[in-house]
């Protein structure tokens, strides 16, 4: 069961979520795959679920230390600065669905968790600043499978109402380009063959009609 600290995270603002996988079952599954040497990806959205996952990862490192384990936090909706420090210390990676910030933060701020927390969804800037390998994904069909659209959200953090949400978490265009290319390749264990243009790697590239590093950031999703 969640400990006292975890329960406080859940009730401090009178909001709570639901476990799609119970803490006991999650730990059981993670332990089995960790000890078998697998790379583990955990889908986690809330900060309570994130804390549980990080606590389990710490247990696994205590039981059987592993380096370059590639443990990845998928979706990464809500987090705290302390949790980001833990992610870095534990050597985990982040694969965030940044599109949810664009699509859901306005409704969340009005009728769900409040503006402050809604604006801090997908803290990509903090992850980059902490030196965490961070990428973004679409979660298709839940969001468009369009990397440049994800890049646009990561750089501008504009929701569908036109509001900038959590401007301090914006990525630079270069960081966002890394997030949809080489960082993504690291997350799936393919950085040695794809994700960047280098001698010996696959000739895996796209020709665009604008330079995403120099164009107007608001036009990123319109690049053809």
Give each language-model segment a name.
Residues 1-11:
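Single conserved hydrophobic/aromatic residue that forms the stacking wall/gate
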Residues 5, 93-95:
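Short, solvent-exposed beta-strand-terminating loops
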Residues 24-29:
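Short, acidic/polar
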